[in-house]
């Protein structure tokens, strides 16, 4: 195997093994390469691993849905600049392990309904937390079950959204692992 191909293989391994992601700076230091070269390799590896955007496999069976907010903190607003707003992300995780996460403009029932329609089969059963925006959004699906986090209910039989919450936590930790902050 050539040294450049070996570097790509090692780069891919480091990216995949880093639970909280890995920055191009860190991999460049570890491999003794230039950061722009590693950055380019990382993007090529990600592109090769990406699902075909034309193939939109819909999530089916039991699908967990949740939202999270990603972005800067108010303490990062300086010199009278507006406070940065966090970006809403809707996460959908099928119990078979497939998932979709999309940045949305707002978290309301219309936006969530459109997201569900695009990525989830109508025969799916949707599990959510007690968010008020979900009941209207999931109408037309096979079923809808909720867990009430306000009442400290996190699991009720097979009803939970732990997969979504775990994904959201990993998403935020990966931002911290590679970039330390988003502002």
Model-derived segments and their meaning:
Residues 1-183:
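Residue-level recognition of single "structural anchor" positions
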């Amino acid at each position: 195997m050539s040294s450049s191909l070996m570097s790509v293989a090692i780069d891919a391994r480091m990216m995949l093994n880093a639970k909280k992601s890995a920055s191009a700076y860190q991999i460049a230091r570890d491999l003794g390469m230039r950061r722009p070269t590693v950055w380019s390799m990382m993007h090529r590896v990600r592109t090769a691993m990406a699902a075909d955007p034309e193939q939109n496999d819909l999530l089916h069976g039991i699908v967990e849905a949740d939202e999270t907010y990603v972005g800067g903190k108010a303490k990062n607003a300086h010199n009278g600049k507006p406070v940065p707003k966090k970006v809403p992300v809707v996460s959908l995780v099928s119990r078979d392990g497939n998932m979709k996460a999309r940045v949305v403009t707002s978290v309301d029932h219309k936006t969530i309904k459109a997201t569900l329609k695009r990525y989830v089969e109508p025969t799916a059963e949707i599990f959510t937390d007690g968010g008020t925006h979900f009941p209207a959004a999931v109408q037309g699906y096979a079923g809808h079950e909720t867990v009430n986090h306000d009442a400290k209910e996190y699991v009720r039989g097979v009803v939970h959204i732990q997969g979504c919450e775990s994904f959201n936590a990993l998403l935020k930790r990966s931002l911290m692992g590679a970039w330390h902050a988003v502002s």
